[in-house]
């Protein structure tokens, strides 16, 4: 039954959002996201377009004996602090139900705030990791280094690495709690005291990467998948080889896997998109 629902939902998304309302769509299992771009002065028109689209989807689902769950429907504005200050639309009405536009939403376990600083998500992530480390500390004396390292990788490192590519471009102040988690986990594995230096141990003994290199590694993996067509289309479209551009003269650099970079923009949100971030990955990394 869930498979049938997904097929019908995918057909509905393709029929209405793309053709009639020009809304972008991201869908994972039964979790669907609609997004679109607009200026702050046009927020009322944008809300009307989204509401009309959802109303048509609801009518189609009702005719096919499905139900749209308005209780789980959430809305959020994304932008800079200056842009958000110009937005005066804070509610949306669906089928007579007024839904407040939130300042934070959760998508696949990641808390997204309006300015995409991910401060709330990092705070929640670090709290859960420290809780797991406290639990492991209580049984540390009964474990050897290998077993402790395995448990840390399972309960802590897996949380740190989950969706960490979204932290690219986030300020060092927000990433500091994650690095603290890595440091505490390393001290637990090698049984060092709280204020002992741990940087060289992380690098030489445990072979762990610091948080900023973990982010760079994840971006390189995404770019590699995009170039080999094993990533979603909305990501692959952001990564193009210089040699694939039509009408461009072919040089020897075509074989060097240089990627097309868009025009530099000083907006912080734009600089964090994959089209700009893949410039941090050298062609030597991508060939590995």
Regions found by a protein language model. Name each.
Residues 1-288:
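Hydrophobic/basic alpha-helical segments
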């Amino acid at each position: 039954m869930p498979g049938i629902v997904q097929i019908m939902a995918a057909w509905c998304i393709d029929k209405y959002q793309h053709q009639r309302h020009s809304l972008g769509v991201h869908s994972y299992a039964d979790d669907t996201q609609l997004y679109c771009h607009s200026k702050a002065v046009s927020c009322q028109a944008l809300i009307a377009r989204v509401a009309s689209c959802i109303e048509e989807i609801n009518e189609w689902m009702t005719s096919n004996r499905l139900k749209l769950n308005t209780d789980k429907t959430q809305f959020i504005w994304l932008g800079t602090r200056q842009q958000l200050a110009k937005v005066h639309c804070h509610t949306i009405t669906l089928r007579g139900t007024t839904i407040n536009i939130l300042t934070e939403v959760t998508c696949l376990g990641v808390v997204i705030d309006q300015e995409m600083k991910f401060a709330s998500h990092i705070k929640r992530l670090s709290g859960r990791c420290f809780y797991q480390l406290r639990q492991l500390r209580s049984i540390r004396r009964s474990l050897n280094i290998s077993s402790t390292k395995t448990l840390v990788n399972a309960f802590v490192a897996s949380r740190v690495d989950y969706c960490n590519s979204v932290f690219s471009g986030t300020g060092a102040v927000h990433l500091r709690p994650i690095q603290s988690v890595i440091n505490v986990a390393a001290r637990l594995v090698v049984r060092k005291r709280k204020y002992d230096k741990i940087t060289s141990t992380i690098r030489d003994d445990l072979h762990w990467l610091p948080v900023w290199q973990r982010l760079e590694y994840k971006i390189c993996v995404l770019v590699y998948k995009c170039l080999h067509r094993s990533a979603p289309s909305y990501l692959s479209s952001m990564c193009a080889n210089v040699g694939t551009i039509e009408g461009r003269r072919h040089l020897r650099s075509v074989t060097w896997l240089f990627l097309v970079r868009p025009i530099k923009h000083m907006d912080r949100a734009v600089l964090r998109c994959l089209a700009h971030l893949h410039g941090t990955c050298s062609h030597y990394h991508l060939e590995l």
